[in-house]
Amino acid sequence: MRDTIAKLFKPSNIGTAVFFALNFGLVLLIFAPYSFTPYGIATLLLVYTLTVAISLSPVGEWMLSVFAGAKEIKRTDVKLKLVPLLEAVYNNAKEKSPNMVDSIHLKMIPGNETNAYAIGRRTICVTEGVLNLSDEMIMGIFAHEIGHIANRHSQIQLLIGGANIFISTFILILKAIAWMITGTFGLFALGSRKFTTGCLIGLVGSLSTILVYLWVKLCGLFLMWSSRKNEFVADEYAYSIGFGNQLAYVLDNVIETQTKNGFLKALYSSHPERNERIARLQELGVTYSRW
């Protein structure tokens, strides 16, 4: 837990730290002035700590796996193909990061696309499309995902999930208050039949919706910035344990990481543009070339 919090303040996670600060600040404002009393702050911190504890527990990791549609691998032939490859990569990673978890739990997501996700402290989920790749390519994918686990990126995602539940609850409260005000003015307008009051009703309702939308977009901007930075960190980790060329080949030929056109779409992309990732790997020493 302490190591996860420490890694939250690494340069690549600045956006995530800003996300937490903004959202906790919002909660303080919603419940002001009560939230600025010692008892109020203690209550909010207690609720938030419980949310975080549940998120970082095996329960939180299991829930995220369920949401991702990941299932236990039951077929023997699939295990025989994937598990030895994962163990080979994990052994290299363990030498570099002795404090890493003692084992990695592998799960499968139905679907023909080729992708993989690190979840929580020790889970890697791969789609069925990964089975069509060569062993070298699969190890490149595993190395990248283990990079996320080693750098606690996947645990931080659990923290974000817990924070989203925490914040969403209070945003719902804020919206409920806004609609209560709107309803009160609406009843008054029906009784008085005043045009000005009717306009005020619409204004309050519209502003509450717009402000919530802008807040979510602002927080998403910081999260996506950190997500793109962390992809580079995981790529570098894969290179450092000996799988840089394999990862570069996968990025260039299999996994689509192209950022959509447009400045705003690029800002809200969770992954950097693939050519930039390959170029970074080549700067580190990867010898991969398409030709």
Name each model feature, range by range.
Residues 103-105, 159-160, 244-254:
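Acidic/histidine metal-binding catalytic segments
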